[in-house]
Each structure stands twice: as C-alpha cells, then as structure tokens.
C-alpha cells in the first residue's frame, strides 16, 4: 500500500517493530530495578525486625551483590536512618521506619504493576507486527516459488 492510501510501508513496519523491541527491553530493565527495590525494602524490614527482637549482632552485606558479609555487633536498636526519597533521609524509631518502608513498597509495587500493564500492551503490539511481517515474508516466498 502506498502512504497516500492510509497504509504504511514495509520499512515503516520494520522500524516500528525495532522501536517496540527496544521499548520492551527498556521496560523489562526498569521492571527488574523495581523488583530489586521491593526485595531491598523487604530485606530492610527483616533487619528492623531482627533489631526489634533485641538481637545486638547482625550479618550485613558489604556489597550490593552479596559477595561479602560482615558481622556487625553493638547495634543500638531503637532508631534507624531511613531513605525518604530523592536525597532525604530521616532518623526515626523502628515502627515508623517500617511504616515508611511499607508505604514506599506500596508505591513501588503500584509502579511495577503499571509498568507491567504497559509491557503487556507493548509486547502484544510487537507480536502483532511480527505476525504481519511473517505473513508478508511467507507471501513473498510463495510468489517467488510460483515464478
């Protein structure tokens, strides 16, 4: 079909598929980051519960991937410093920290769900375009065999 008839060219269809593939990859990376944030919040809450139980020692990851642990002793378990967002932190009691972390987890979970919905829409559109491209390729192959 020509552009004047309201259709799109094969090159435009291929470009749209390429764009959607990159968009899907970006959404998947963001989704992974959100899930890692949720896991970090859960770990922080577990640490607070350990502190609330009166345990004065804790194993702490030194790096983000967990290659190195250190035993930390002498923990005073009545206050922690919690990240509020952007570059803001606050020293709060343990129960307040859990409330802040729960709220943050809810926000991130909502964002992850919204992102997942967008990812499903993009994947569906991408799959439709790939199906169309496959049909075009099969039709071209049949025409070539008929010649």
UniProtKB/Swiss-Prot annotation:
User: Coiled-coil annotation: which residues?
Assistant: none
Listed transmembrane segments: none
The record, for Gene3D superfamilies, names:
1.10.287.370
Q: Where in the cell is it found?
A: Cytoplasm
From the UniProt record, which GO molecular function terms apply? Answer: unfolded protein binding
Gene Ontology annotations of biological process type: protein folding
**Name of this protein:** Prefoldin subunit alpha
Please name the source species. Saccharolobus solfataricus (strain ATCC 35092 / DSM 1617 / JCM 11322 / P2)
Q: Gene name, please? A: pfdA
């Amino acid at each position: 079909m020509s552009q004047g008839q309201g259709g799109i060219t094969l090159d435009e269809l291929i470009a749209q598929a390429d764009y959607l593939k990159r968009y899907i990859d970006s959404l998947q990376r963001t989704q992974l980051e959100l899930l890692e944030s949720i896991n970090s919040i859960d770990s922080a809450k577990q640490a607070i519960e350990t502190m609330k139980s009166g345990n004065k020692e804790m194993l702490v990851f030194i790096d983000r991937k967990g290659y190195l642990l250190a035993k930390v002793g002498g923990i005073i378990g009545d206050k922690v410093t919690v990240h509020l967002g952007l570059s803001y932190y606050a020293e709060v009691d343990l129960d307040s920290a859990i409330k802040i972390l729960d709220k943050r987890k809810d926000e991130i979970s909502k964002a992850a769900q919204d992102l997942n919905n967008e990812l499903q829409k993009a994947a569906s559109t991408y799959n439709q375009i790939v199906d169309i491209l496959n049909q075009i390729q099969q039709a071209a192959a049949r025409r070539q065999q008929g010649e």
